[in-house]
A protein has these predicted regions:
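Generic structural signal for well-ordered alpha-helices
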Residues: 10, 14, 54-58, 84-88, ...
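Glycine/proline-rich, positively charged
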Residues: 37-137, 141, 148
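Aromatic-lined glycan-binding groove of carbohydrate-active enzymes
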Residues: 137-174, 209
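Conserved, mostly hydrophobic/aromatic
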Residues: 1, 13, 28, 57, ...
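Conserved short secondary-structure transition element at the edge of the structured enzyme core
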Residues: 91, 158, 177, 187-245
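N-terminal binding-site loop/beta-alpha segment at the start of enzyme catalytic domains
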Residues: 1-27, 92, 267
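A short acidic, helix-capping loop that chelates divalent metal ions and anchors anionic groups
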Residues: 35-41, 164, 237-238
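Active-site-proximal loop/turn and secondary-structure-junction residues that shape catalytic pockets
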Residues: 4, 32-34, 72-75, 103-105, ...
Length: 268
């Protein structure tokens, strides 16, 4: 996304692509709407903000087009008609191939899709929501809506900020310092602890890692591609090996049955 490191993440990716990859073999996704500076056109989903940010992203990435452009959050200050028209124009221009949305309410996503369909504009193909074994509120409406519309699910935080990868009482620097993760997960610790322990039990049962069990659970839910942070090579290996883990219906029930409803987080 543009806001990650104020564009630095896009610049780093662009240099890596130039040195190590063929553009045709890579799928590049980025986001718009986050604040990139002061002023009315430095954030949000107005036509001007979208066009400016996409041009800036293309320059930082050093490419001619973006494969998937996400709107990072819903913009309550811009009519959705203006946003969808601008996004459609980007697709028509060839600067963007597909559109995605992230972290919003189901009624908002349905409205955006309706506006696009009514006007003959490009609709969203991907939904990037917050979804994992410790946060399953997307199952209430969004996941079913996407399934009905044929929209791919590409959830972020599939490992709950690492909580699903380690024993409950273990410690880490991120666990201590990640304030955003604490807001997301630290209000339901009693039930979350049981779920994490059960992930560990299933991992031992199949002689795999806890990460692989957590990702395999997502595969069982019809997810297309969980977004996994790959800061180390072994994390990529875990992601790949999770494809081979086949959970039974009993496993899935065991992992899910202690879940309790959570407050909605991430949409604002």
């Amino acid at each position: 996304a543009t806001v990650y490191g104020w564009g630095a993440s896009e610049e780093i990716l662009g240099r890596a692509l130039k040195d190590y990859a063929s553009r045709d073999e890579i799928v590049i996704a980025t986001k718009v709407s986050g604040s990139m500076g002061k002023g009315p056109n430095k954030s949000g989903l107005s036509r001007k903000a979208i066009m400016n940010e996409v041009d800036a992203s293309l320059k930082r990435l050093g490419v001619e087009y973006i494969d998937i452009l996400y709107i990072h959050r819903w913009d309550y200050n811009t009519p959705i008609e203006e946003t969808m028209c601008a996004l459609n124009d980007l697709v028509r221009s060839g600067k963007v191939l597909y559109l995605g949305a992230s972290s919003m309410y189901a009624w908002q996503f349905a409205k955006a899709q309706y506006i696009a369909e009514k006007n003959g504009w490009t609709k969203f193909s991907v939904m990037q929501g917050h979804y994992n074994l410790l946060y399953r509120e997307e199952e209430r409406e969004m996941n079913q809506l996407c399934k009905d519309m044929g929209v791919a699910l590409v959830p972020y935080s599939p490992l709950a900020a690492g909580r699903l990868t380690r024993d409950w009482n273990s410690d880490s620097k991120r666990f201590k310092e990640d304030k955003v993760a604490k807001v997301k997960y630290d209000t339901t610790e009693e039930s979350d602890k049981i779920i994490v322990e059960r992930v560990s039990e299933i991992a031992k049962k199949y002689n795999v890692t806890k990460s692989q069990v957590s990702i395999a659970w997502l595969w069982s839910k019809g997810v297309t591609a969980p977004i996994v942070g790959v800061t180390k090579e072994k994390y990529l290996y875990d992601f790949e090996q999770a494809l081979k883990v086949k959970l039974t219906d009993e496993d899935i029930k065991y992992l899910e049955e202690k879940y309790i409803p959570h407050n909605i987080v991430g949409h604002e």
